[in-house]
Amino acid sequence: MKFIGLATLSLFALASADKFPVPDSITVAEGSSKCGDQAQLSCCNDVKYGGDTTVVQKGIAAGLLSDLLGAGSAAEGLGAFSGCSKLDISLLIGIEDILNQKCKQNIACCAKSGGSADGDLVGATLPCIALGSIL
């Protein structure tokens, strides 16, 4: 009986673990610099990643452009993040604050854009990418 409880707890821990964890030593400033000037360091409540795909390539030039276009494992880390709030460096008191202490959920780099999908027929907002996938 104890084994079943331990096995269930272990499976739950694996399922709830972050897919792209951020090391404990990364500061907010370092995380922001990894995002670059075109993205904003954000803390997101929820994320949904697309499923893994397997593509069988046939022929001489098969799959030549697939990695350039974002197919397969090249799209790793891209997800649908929701409930994101920006982590602004200028508002933080200590610039050396540890990132994992400021955000306990999903840490991501979200594109800086004024775009919004609200009230638009074909509205789209740019996605976020998990910070742990680019470290």
Swiss-Prot record:
Induction field: Expressed after 12 to 24 hours post induction of asexual development, which correlates with the development of metulae and phialides. Not expressed in hyphae and strongly induced during development.
A Pfam family of this chain: Hydrophobin
Molecular-function GO terms, alphabetical: structural constituent of cell wall
Keyword Chaperone among UniProt keywords: no
Keyword set, alphabetical order: Conidiation, Disulfide bond, Secreted, Signal, Sporulation
Record localization: Secreted; Spore wall
Signal sequence annotation: 1-17
InterPro entries reported in the protein's UniProt record: Hydrophobin
Disulfide bonds: 35-109, 43-103, 44-84, 110-128
Any one of the GO CC terms: fungal-type cell wall
Keyword Secreted: yes
Domain of life of the organism encoding this protein: Eukaryota
Assembly and interaction partners: Self-assembles to form functional amyloid fibrils called rodlets. Self-assembly into fibrillar rodlets occurs spontaneously at hydrophobic:hydrophilic interfaces and the rodlets further associate laterally to form amphipathic monolayers.
Known function: Aerial growth, conidiation, and dispersal of filamentous fungi in the environment rely upon a capability of their secreting small amphipathic proteins called hydrophobins (HPBs) with low sequence identity. Class I can self-assemble into an outermost layer of rodlet bundles on aerial cell surfaces, conferring cellular hydrophobicity that supports fungal growth, development and dispersal; whereas Class II form highly ordered films at water-air interfaces through intermolecular interactions but contribute nothing to the rodlet structure.
Family membership: Belongs to the fungal hydrophobin family.
Identification of the protein by name: Class I hydrophobin dewB
Gene this protein is translated from: dewB
